[in-house]
Amino acid sequence: MCRQNCRAKSSPEEVISTDENLLIYCKPVRLYNIFHLRSLGNPSFLPRCLNYKIGAKRKRKSRSTGMVVFNYKDCNNTLQRTEVREDCSCPFCSMLCGSFKGLQFHLNSSHDLFEFEFKLLEEYQTVNVSVKLNSFIFEEEGSDDDKFEPFSLCSKPRKRRQRGGRNNTRRLKVCFLPLDSPSLANGTENGIALLNDGNRGLGYPEATELAGQFEMTSNIPPAIAHSSLDAGAKVILTTEAVVPATKTRKLSAERSEARSHLLLQKRQFYHSHRVQPMALEQVMSDRDSEDEVDDDVADFEDRQMLDDFVDVNKDEKQFMHLWNSFVRKQRVIADGHISWACEVFSRFYEKELHCYSSLFWCWRLFLIKLWNHGLVDSATINNCNTILENCRNTSVTNNNNNSVDHPSDSNTNNNNIVDHPNDIKNKNNVDNKDNNSRDK
């Protein structure tokens, strides 16, 4: 649009005096029109004067300086592949080096597995790339440095010196338990306790295993606990004592269980949902309190949640609470359980729904919503209404039966109304006296 307007405003004088107009400052669009009018007679004038041609020339010149040709050669110095990279970028890691000299420093320092030959030509730069064959020779063959030479180290395991000489054996602090159990008491003869289960000879496998653990020799007999009835009897202990491993494990397990039992008795545990104190039997049982559901606490939380609703009246909150508690107790989870739950809910709360009409209408609206969502069908709604109608009919018949009097009760009332004959005579005498007084 600007070019057309300027072209329309231009006059023949401007076409003639283009050289003079170039010397005067003018707008770029007008200057471009002057160039265009002048290029009609000289077509080569416009490409030489436009700025984009000048910029293209600069760009071409910069490309020529930044263009690098990589010639990849094999071991026999045979050309295998040629690649052209611009902006002096590395062909291996694509790093911009900025200049050919920077590219030379980068290739020699970062890619030392290749051998590079750099050549500068008038039009472009060339880099001949070949593989260093010496880089694949292992360092073990030509390593003159002593730091890289392998060496061997041989060390003997150190023996731990014992206090008091080499031949001293380790001593164990053995505690003998009192012979309270009947099985141990039966094995005592002449005040010497012969523990057949615990202390065995070295011929048994358990004894030999323990002897190997405690560095026992065949010359040292096992320790035997002597218990005598005399008060002056002494307990003789040898250098080693054989204690069965199974017995010690059982004793340690029993002690740990007793200790944990005492710790559980000292602490007070509470239920996770009800926050009520737990008895020791409940703590030691396998049942987890996390899985339990307290109905009272759940009802209380449900009522608190419903009380926060503002746009719901009291009757609707009562119905919602009844339905929520029923669904929770009966574990109604899937959509297929809704039909059964509606019928059972109608039977369970038929008296409440019959006595309170507001709850009854809330129940009907709830059934309609379930039907809209496709959770119940018309047969389920019919069954629920039939249950409530039967409840209403039974209540009406009971009321009618209570209002009708029994025949025996009416006869008793009539008998009570009949007067005695003496009472009738007294009434007649009173009437006659009244009449005589009136005549006088």
UniProtKB/Swiss-Prot annotation:
A zinc finger (C2H2-type) spans 86-111. Residues 420-440 have a biased composition (Basic and acidic residues). It holds the Pfam family VEFS-Box. Residues 398-440 are annotated as: Disordered. It is found in: Nucleus. The keyword Transferase does not apply. One of its GO terms (molecular function) is DNA-binding transcription factor activity. Its main location: nucleus. One of its GO terms (biological process) is vernalization response. Keywords: Metal-binding, Nucleus, Repressor, Transcription, Transcription regulation, Zinc, Zinc-finger. InterPro entries: Polycomb_protein_VEFS-Box. Coiled coil: none annotated. It comes from the Eukaryota. Residues 267-345 are annotated as: VEFS-box. One of its GO terms (cellular component) is nucleus. A motif (Nuclear localization signal) lies at residues 156-163. Signal peptide: none annotated. Weakly expressed. Expressed both during, and in the absence of vernalization. PANTHER family: POLYCOMB GROUP PROTEIN, POLYCOMB GROUP PROTEIN VERNALIZATION 2. Polycomb group (PcG) protein. Plays a central role in vernalization by maintaining repressed the homeotic gene FLC, a floral repressor, after a cold treatment. PcG proteins act by forming multiprotein complexes, which are required to maintain the transcriptionally repressive state of homeotic genes throughout development. PcG proteins are not required to initiate repression, but to maintain it during later stages of development. They probably act via the methylation of histones, rendering chromatin heritably changed in its expressibility. Associates constitutively along the whole FLC locus. Probable component of a PcG complex. In plants, PcG complexes are probably composed of a member of the EZ family (CLF or MEA), FIE, and a member of the VEFS family (FIS2, VRN2 or EMF2). Component of the plant homeodomain / polycomb repressive complex 2 (PHD-PRC2) large complex during prolonged cold, composed of core PRC2 components (VRN2, EZA1, FIE and MSI1), and three related PHD finger proteins (VIL1, VIL2 and VIN3) that mediates histone H3 trimethylation on 'Lys-27' (H3K27me3). Binds to ALP1. Belongs to the VEFS (VRN2-EMF2-FIS2-SU(Z)12) family. This is Polycomb group protein VERNALIZATION 2. It comes from Arabidopsis thaliana (Mouse-ear cress).
